[in-house]
Every structure is written in structure tokens, then in C-alpha cells.
């Protein structure tokens, strides 16, 4: 199915591939780690690199972070975002980090030092920006950035950076996880809420 998404539009990507966020490079590498199908992995490299470059061209802000509408980010409507708002969100920036790390690892696997370094530097840059700009030091949480200011709301998407092991292993960031089990935080009878249940800073 991934060949259809990337090559099903007269040899090019399907139209929606250019609108909705994804961590496909990370996923394709993850599949290789399971099935060992190197031929499939290498066959996808040019497609994955082209997709990465496209996101850089269309969704990178002047500060180096990436923006996305909440609907196109798989969140439908959210407190922090908007369908047509170009806000830097923890989600897409984590995806771009994960994809850059994956492409760098593919470069290492194939002996392509230039590719490995290119995407390794991109990943390092995104990591620094996410930790410096999306971390709200008052709320102790990764939050969406509206222009030059935080959206000032803690949402479940603030945990996405950990899916890609982006944050430094530090109590500075680990403190965010105490909200998961807090019934006044994200904990609810049927799973996590999409946003925090209270608005004041954590005690």
C-alpha cells in the first residue's frame, strides 16, 4: 500500500500525501528492522527523501520549526490549533525528527556518509528547537507554539516527542509524565483526555 501512496499518482505521490503529517520514513525503517527486507527499504529511499524535502519547502517556518493544521495533523479540532493556522506543533516536529533520524540511520546502513550526516544534522537541529521553543517551562510540558508564544495549553500531543526518543533523558522533561496518572490531569476512565483537565500550573 505504501507504493500506492508514493507512486500511485502517475508515478508520483497521492495528493493527500502532501497535506497530512506522517512518520513514514521512521515506519519504513521500523518494518525493515522486523522483516529484514533491505531491498524494499532501499527502493523507498528516494521517495522518502523527496517527501522530506517537500515538507521542508512547504511547512517549515522561518524559525526552523514545522507547522501543521490540527486536522491535517490527525487531531481534528484542538484547543491549540486550527484548520488553517500555521502553528508549530509537537506532533509534526516530532515526526520530522523521527524521519530525519531514520534517514540518517539508512545512510549509515548503506555506507552513505553524506546522507547520514545530512539528516543527522537536521535531526539535531529539530531536537534543539523542540526543547528550546516548544517546552513550556511554567507548565513543564511540550506545547504548541502560536507565532512567538506558547498556546498555553497542555494536550496529549505533548507526549509525542517521546515516541521518537527526542527529549533528553532528564528530570526536567520527565516531570511531564506525572500528568498521565493524575485524574486532574490526563487520566480518565476510558483513556487519556486530549487536553489537561485543569488549567493552572502543576503543583
Language model feature labels by segment:
Residues 15-17, 95-105, 125-133, 148, ...:
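C-terminal extensions
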Residues 20-23, 40, 44-47, 122, ...:
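Short acidic-hydrophobic sequence patches enriched in Asp/Glu that either
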Residues 23-40, 94-112, 160-170:
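Well-ordered alpha-helical scaffold segments within catalytic/enzyme domains
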Residues 54, 102-105, 175:
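Alpha-helical scaffold segments in soluble metabolic enzymes
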Residues 86, 93, 151-182:
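Aromatic (Trp/Tyr) and acidic
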Residues 198-203:
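Conserved small/polar residues in nucleotide/adenosyl-binding loops
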Residues 1, 32-91, 114, 118-121, ...:
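Active-site acid/base region of carbohydrate-active enzymes
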Residues 1-28, 69-80, 89-100, 107-110:
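Aromatic-lined, polymer-binding surfaces characteristic
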Amino acid at each position: 500500500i505504501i507504493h500506492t501512496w508514493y507512486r500511485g499518482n502517475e508515478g508520483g505521490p497521492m495528493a493527500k500525501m502532501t497535506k497530512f503529517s506522517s512518520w513514514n520514513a521512521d515506519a519504513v525503517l521500523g518494518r525493515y528492522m522486523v522483516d529484514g527486507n533491505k531491498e524494499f527499504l532501499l527502493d523507498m529511499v528516494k521517495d522518502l527523501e523527496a517527501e522530506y524535502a517537500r515538507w521542508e519547502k512547504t511547512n517549515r517556518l522561518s524559525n526552523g520549526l514545522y507547522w501543521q493544521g490540527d486536522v491535517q495533523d490527525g487531531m481534528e479540532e484542538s484547543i491549540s490549533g486550527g484548520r488553517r493556522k500555521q502553528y508549530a506543533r509537537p506532533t509534526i516536529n516530532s515526526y520530522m525528527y523521527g524521519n530525519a533520524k531514520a534517514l540518517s540511520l539508512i545512510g549509515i546502513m548503506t555506507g552513505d556518509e553524506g546522507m547520514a550526516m545530512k539528516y543527522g544534522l537536521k535531526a539535531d537541529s529539530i531536537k534543539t528547537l523542540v526543547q528550546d521553543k516548544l517546552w513550556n517551562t511554567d507548565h513543564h510540558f511540550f506545547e504548541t507554539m502560536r507565532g512567538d508564544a506558547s498556546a498555553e495549553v497542555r494536550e496529549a500531543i505533548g507526549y509525542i516527542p517521546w515516541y521518537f526518543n527526542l527529549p533528553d533523558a532528564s528530570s526536567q522533561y520527565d516531570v511531564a509524565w506525572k500528568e498521565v496518572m493524575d485524574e486532574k490531569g490526563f487520566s480518565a476512565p476510558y483513556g487519556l483526555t486530549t487536553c489537561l483537565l485543569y488549567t493552572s500550573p502543576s503543583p
